[in-house]
Amino acid sequence: MKRTLFASIAIVATAWASAPVSADEMKAEVIHWWTSGGEAAAVKVFADQFTKAGGTWVDSAVAGAANARNAAISRTVAGNPPTAMQLNTGKQFDELVEGGLLADVDTIATEGNWKGVMPAAIIAAATRNGKMYAVPINIHGQNWLWYNKAVLASVGADEPKTWNDAIAILDKLKADGKVIPLAFSGQKNWEQNLFNAVMIGVGGAQMWTGILGKRDASLARSAEFKAVAVTYKKLKDYVDAGAPGRNWNDATNMVIQGKAGMQIMGDWAKGEFIAAGKVADKDYGCTVLSNGSGGYVMGGDVFVFPKAKDPSTTKAQLTLARLMLTPETQIQFALKKGSIPVRSDVDTSALDACAQKGMRYVADKAQQMPSGDMLAPPATIGALQDAISQYWNTNMSADEFSAKVAAVLKSQE
């Protein structure tokens, strides 16, 4: 089943009409969803670099990734596009390319030797029909565990290595009763993010690629998948009653403030620790949990550029594409965002202990796992998200969930 962009995205009339731009003025309206403290500090790096290059950055931040995507895509389809829009690394811009709505960045990619300095999976995720249509700006690990070191020390716990270790510590924190064991954001996308971390860590790499990449319905009916489902549902025992609807960064702040012990979240969470003045390996720790055959779920962010008729807009787009990937910008952005540079040829000595761990994961090809957005189209991701949310929020059994996921995968063939 394929839901086309033009059917699934409502074309909403908008009052965001761009002001006329003179031929010698370089102006860029950028739609993104970076609105938390750490995210805002990171995107300012791009804005400042663009301003230094003589441009005017028009910040069109929209809270929530889905909201920002829908706003940007709707405007592009309606003929009133922004200069640049943020998307996740993966398949989210497929139909924009198919519709002839995006400009490729192949010339800039060749000029900057992107293929020589980025992981092959990232290049592939940005390439359509032999040309690059997206600027990958970072690599985010999606399945990190973050923990407050003082809180874990208070119950005599060391850094967990496996999901079994983590659950044992969560049991200790729950029995101690002083903090919330697991900080959680009860929103659909973060329910799915937690499930994904369990699936890769408990189910392993073959299950990850089998479910998301191959859409193998028989695998969803397996005992191994049901074990993943049971582990996932067990985690609900460790979250608080205030979790439903909570923002992810508010959950991160619970760990920062010592009100919660742990959080499963991508390394964008580290930007919140940084903004709060916390130091990796001193105030907080980080690890990726695996019961033996997991991996590092590697995603990130890209910017794409709608086709423009105005030469000054094209100039702004090319300038953005270049400056986002200069070594200086890459490091400055990573230090604020919590991600790691997408380029392998930058000096990473200034990165903290958690980022250094991330660099080691990415350097190990056996650990590199493409994100769900790289493996599956948005329709599949959305259908799985609905199933996961229903399982988390109801009394649905693991067997029922297994059957539901199998049906979703079958319908997406």
What is each residue range found by the language model?
Residues 21-99, 111-112, 159, 244, ...:
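Conserved N-terminal structural module of periplasmic/extracytoplasmic solute-binding proteins
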Residues 24, 48, 52-53, 78, ...:
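Extracytoplasmic/periplasmic substrate-recognition and gating elements
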Residues 33, 92, 193, 230-313:
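Extracytoplasmic/periplasmic substrate-binding proteins
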Residues 74-75, 82-83, 114-147, 180-181, ...:
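A structural signal for short loop-to-beta-strand junctions that line the ligand-binding cleft
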Residues 88-142, 167, 194, 281, ...:
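Hinge/lid segment of periplasmic solute-binding proteins
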Residues 132-137, 167-217, 260:
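Extracytoplasmic/periplasmic solute-binding protein
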Residues 170-172, 213-244:
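Glycine-centered hinge/linker elements that transmit conformational signals in sensory
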Residues 339-344, 356-413:
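C-terminal capping/gating helix-and-loop segments adjacent to ligand/active sites or protein-protein/ligand interfaces
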